[in-house]
């Protein structure tokens, strides 16, 4: 079995990345996506100081890490688009490894994605609909337009 070195690095540094993300979200007030991007840059900068990591590996590492966020989205067209990503399989494998270590909701998430991959179109649609029932999207707020003030 061949293993991509970028996958190994992404797996080894997942938890240091998570620690940096938590710090950035708490102290910097950043949203999840921005915190992951900045934390990923910091972790990879530290890695590149001690190891020569070519860009072809660092870009794959970033993709795997950012796909962990996309794997959380199981409604609408997100699952189909996520599965079309070139590095989906590596990201799913990392999710499965995390599920073995972390347990809890990660196990359920990995199980759902495993089932989604093995399903046909109709079964996938049903899986997504079940998720939409469990986690409905918030209703849009509609605001009335204010009447313009009369000029005196």
Go through each PLM region and give its residues.
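Catalytic cores of the polymerase beta-like nucleotidyltransferase superfamily
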Residues: 1-152
């Amino acid at each position: 079995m061949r293993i991509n070195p970028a996958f190994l690095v992404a797996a080894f540094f997942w938890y240091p990345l998570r620690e940096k993300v938590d710090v950035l979200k708490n102290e910097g007030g950043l949203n999840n996506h921005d915190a992951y991007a900045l934390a990923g840059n910091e972790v990879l900068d530290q890695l590149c100081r001690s190891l020569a990591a070519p860009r072809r590996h660092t870009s794959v590492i970033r993709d795997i890490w950012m796909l962990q966020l996309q794997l959380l989205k199981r409604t609408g067209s997100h699952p189909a688009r996520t599965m079309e990503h070139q590095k989906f399989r590596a990201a799913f494998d990392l999710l499965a490894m995390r599920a073995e270590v972390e347990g809890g909701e990660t196990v359920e998430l990995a199980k759902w994605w495993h089932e989604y991959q093995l399903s046909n179109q109709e079964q996938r649609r049903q899986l997504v609909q079940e998720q939409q029932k469990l986690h409905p999207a918030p209703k849009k707020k509609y605001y009335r337009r204010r009447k313009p003030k009369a000029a005196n």
